[in-house]
């Protein structure tokens, strides 16, 4: 597993070999989370001050992309170790409040533009979907709640991919997973 941090101005910095990592995927709420540890050197300090995103890749495939909540560098028995922690991209929608608004026959693209794009969240393109009647977003609601509420009215379920992209799927687009007493599995969820 390889870790990298990204700054708001688009610069990407590769982290040294990860000593430890934990990736927790939920796809929605509560949002995904991560923790990564690697050796720290003083040259990393400036990049880390501006770091806002983290990505973990394996064999060129993104396994996780999220928001950095905190980082710390500690000098101890293991040497100087950097710990980077945070949450999935859903955190941007959960942490930001929507303004009160009432839509008249809103389109999904309008809801996504108002609530996802405003937070810098990318979404998977799909055909246009229109709500029926009025759709109101209460003052103080999270942007996630604004999107999720509209999506569910339209028969869609919002979730985030491991690449940090917001997707909306209908019930017919899901997939069924069956576990028939697999040997050695103690716990499983999807």
Region locations from a protein language model:
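Juxtamembrane "anchor/assembly" segments of surface/extracellular structural proteins
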Residues: 1-47, 88-91
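A short, compositionally biased
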Residues: 1-2, 47-52, 152-154
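Hydrophobic beta-strand residues in large extracellular and virion-surface proteins
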Residues: 3-5, 34-36, 54-56, 68, ...
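Short amphipathic beta-strand/extended segments with alternating polar/hydrophobic composition
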Residues: 12-18, 64-69, 97, 104, ...
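Short, ordered beta-strand-loop transition motifs
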Residues: 23-32, 73-80, 160-163
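Surface-exposed cap/loop segments at beta↔alpha junctions
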Residues: 39-122
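Short beta-strand-centered interaction patches in the first periplasmic/extracellular domains
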Residues: 79-81, 85-91, 125-190
